[in-house]
Amino acid sequence: MERNQRKTLVGRVVSDKMDKTITVVVETKRNHPVYGKRINYSKKYKAHDENNVAKEGDIVRIMETRPLSATKHFRLVEVVEEAVII
């Protein structure tokens, strides 16, 4: 499989407490199968952050990769938007 055909997701970093690992929550909208109402779904993914550049609250792009651990199957591609510190 070519690298550009791998699944890429955009989400928000909710945890950066682990070394070289971030937790990213990806939010999607889907229609309810019976009622047709738009419903928000969210799913958490663990991603590899080699240089520990992503911080909590950042918007990041992650890409599917080979399994790096029991729960880590994504890696950080880029930080799309840094978190605003108030």
Curated annotation (Swiss-Prot):
Alphabetic keyword roster: Ribonucleoprotein, Ribosomal protein, RNA-binding, rRNA-binding
InterPro entries per record: NA-bd_OB-fold, Ribosomal_uS17, Ribosomal_uS17_bact/chlr, Ribosomal_uS17_CS
GO molecular function ontology, one term from the record: structural constituent of ribosome
A GO CC term attached to the entry: cytosolic small ribosomal subunit
GO annotation terms (biological process): translation
CDD domains listed in its UniProt record: Ribosomal_uS17
Pfam families cross-referenced by the UniProt entry: Ribosomal_S17 (PF00366)
Source organism superkingdom: Bacteria
Family matches, as PANTHER family: 40S RIBOSOMAL PROTEIN S11 FAMILY MEMBER (PTHR10744), SMALL RIBOSOMAL SUBUNIT PROTEIN US17M (PTHR10744:SF1)
Self-association state and partner proteins as the record states: Part of the 30S ribosomal subunit.
Role this protein plays: One of the primary rRNA binding proteins, it binds specifically to the 5'-end of 16S ribosomal RNA.
HAMAP family per the UniProt record, alphabetical: Ribosomal_uS17_B
Family the entry assigns: Belongs to the universal ribosomal protein uS17 family.
Name this polypeptide is given: Small ribosomal subunit protein uS17
Organism of derivation: Streptococcus thermophilus (strain ATCC BAA-250 / LMG 18311)
Gene name as annotated: rpsQ
